[in-house]
Amino acid sequence: MRLTNTHDISLENTIQGIKLAYPSLKQVSGIFGFIDRNFNDEHIPLISGGGAGHDPAHWGFVGPGMLSASITGELFEPPTPEEIITVTKKTTTLKKAFYIVKNFPKD
């Protein structure tokens, strides 16, 4: 008996569901990253992330007065440095950001 999709399909289904349920979030194209559409670039962004499979962390905390953006890696894997940089560049034009991103070995 199979209870879940393959992890690739499961992540894509999650992204599609988030986009439909939370129009205040903008997906970063090509990766599992979300930005608060109302983020004001005059402020230093707070960006958090970790591995997929712990939803709604971290995208569930993106919004006014909370996270500016989130980045999620593959299933039970932290996001890559390249993914973190991509989300940062899409979030702000400032040369600074505050990060809370978990780094751990793959499960």
What is the meaning of each model-derived region?
Residues 1-46:
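N-terminal amphipathic/basic leader segments beginning at the initiator methionine
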Residues 31-34, 51-56:
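Short, functional N-terminal and low-complexity linear motifs
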Residues 54, 58-94:
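Glycine-rich oxoanion-binding loops at beta->alpha junctions
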Residues 14-17, 45-49, 63, 69-70, ...:
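Small-side-chain structural scaffolding
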Residues 32-34, 39, 61, 76, ...:
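Phenylalanine-focused residue identity feature
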Residues 6-13, 41, 53, 57, ...:
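Conserved active-site and cofactor/substrate-binding residues in soluble primary-metabolism enzymes
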Residues 14-26, 88, 92, 101, ...:
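Structural signal for hydrophobic packing residues in well-ordered secondary-structure cores
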Residues 44-51, 67-70, 96-105:
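Short glycine-rich or small-residue beta-strand-to-loop segments that form or flank ligand, phosphate
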